[in-house]
């Protein structure tokens, strides 16, 4: 009798345990109540959920980057429009029909365009500077309060976007791409001349910077990416304040010139002055105007190239966005397949459990009806 009761109670406990899991599945829609129910399935589900979390984070970053890309595209469109207007003003100024008063009026227009370009050069999106490369929390360009010279404050790096596990791709362009153009190139061992506001880039996109390595207030070498612990290129200072160096890098160097410096030269020429404020002749000014037209066309070409790069890099990011979204969709399907309960099967099992409960309790009742005397007899 005792053995029968123990057996019945054991079966009842198993039944209760299974019934709890069935009810959990029906109420939550989840296939596992505890990881120990099926450790292999549980580990697989955890892997899916971890991947989902990772790709969701990547997708959020890509979505956030959309605003940056859109802002970069819009800023470059405005920059190009302003440069087109400047080129038109140069052409108008360099004609016989435009007198000196008209040229001085154009000089004021050019100064206005310079201010506009300076503002656009420091465009931001969600607090990030569009043209500072990886240093997007720092202002891209500054203007000297005394001379009005505009200089780039960042480096030749690019902002990047996480598009896959451990994979990043470039986004946008930097200030060198947009507001500088190649003014000269120097092959290995060639001698080249440059100014303090020009930027020197090698074939590996490294920047060679004038640096004061001993803190004596005087620049004493061109250092790779501004690293004063590295080997440097020596230079000599020329009478006009420019510098001359010999390319000892073994690579081709590009000397990048700023559109802002060209605008300063252009404004001075329109006012019949040189960079020091000395008076120049109209013939000398005409030569500068012609040179400025060529330089501004080169600058405009760089802007077009930069705009194209923004577009192609944005398209690459969009392609990865579609891939990430597809992965998230597939992961959701997999998680649903492995983590979701089969409600139809559980409903059938619940009915079977109910029938089993009925039969088991019927047995328990019959056993309870048996008295010890009846049992012994």
Identify the role of each PLM range:
Residues 1-140, 271-275, 279-377:
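Amphipathic alpha-helical polymerization modules
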Residues 139-284:
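Cysteine-poor, low-complexity segments in flexible/peripheral regions
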């Amino acid at each position: 009798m005792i053995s029968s009761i123990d057996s019945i109670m054991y079966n009842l406990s198993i039944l209760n345990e299974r019934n709890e899991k069935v009810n959990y599945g029906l109420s939550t829609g989840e296939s596992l109540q505890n990881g120990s129910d099926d450790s292999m399935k549980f580990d697989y589900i955890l892997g899916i959920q971890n991947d989902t979390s990772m790709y969701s984070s990547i997708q959020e970053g890509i979505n956030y980057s959309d605003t940056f890309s859109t802002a970069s595209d819009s800023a470059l469109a405005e920059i190009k429009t302003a440069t087109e207007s400047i080129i038109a003003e140069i052409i108008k100024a360099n004609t016989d029909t435009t007198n000196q008063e008209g040229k001085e009026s154009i000089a004021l227009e050019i100064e206005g365009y310079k201010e506009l370009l300076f503002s656009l050069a420091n465009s931001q999106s969600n607090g990030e500077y569009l043209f500072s490369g990886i240093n997007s929390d720092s202002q891209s360009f500054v203007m000297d309060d005394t001379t009005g010279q505009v200089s780039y404050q960042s480096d030749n790096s690019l902002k990047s976007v996480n598009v896959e596990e451990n994979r990043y791709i470039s986004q946008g362009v930097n200030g060198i791409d947009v507001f500088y153009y190649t003014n000269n190139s120097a092959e290995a061992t060639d001698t080249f001349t440059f100014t303090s506001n020009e930027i020197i880039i090698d074939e590996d996109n490294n920047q060679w910077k004038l640096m004061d390595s001993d803190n004596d207030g005087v620049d004493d070498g061109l250092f790779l990416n501004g690293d004063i612990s590295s080997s440097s290129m020596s230079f000599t200072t020329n009478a006009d304040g420019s510098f001359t160096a010999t390319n000892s890098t073994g690579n081709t160097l590009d000397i990048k010139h700023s559109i802002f410096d060209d605008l300063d030269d252009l404004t001075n020429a329109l006012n019949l002055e040189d960079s020091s404020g000395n008076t120049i002749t109209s013939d000398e000014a005409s030569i500068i105007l012609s040179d400025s037209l060529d330089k501004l066309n080169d600058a405009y070409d760089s802007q077009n190239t930069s705009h194209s790069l923004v577009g192609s890099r944005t398209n690459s990011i969009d392609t990865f966005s579609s891939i990430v979204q597809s992965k998230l969709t597939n992961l959701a399907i997999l998680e649903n397949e492995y983590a979701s309960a089969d409600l139809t099967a559980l409903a059938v099992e619940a009915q079977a459990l109910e029938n089993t409960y009925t039969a088991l309790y019927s047995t328990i009742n019959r056993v309870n009806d048996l008295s010890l005397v009846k049992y012994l007899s």
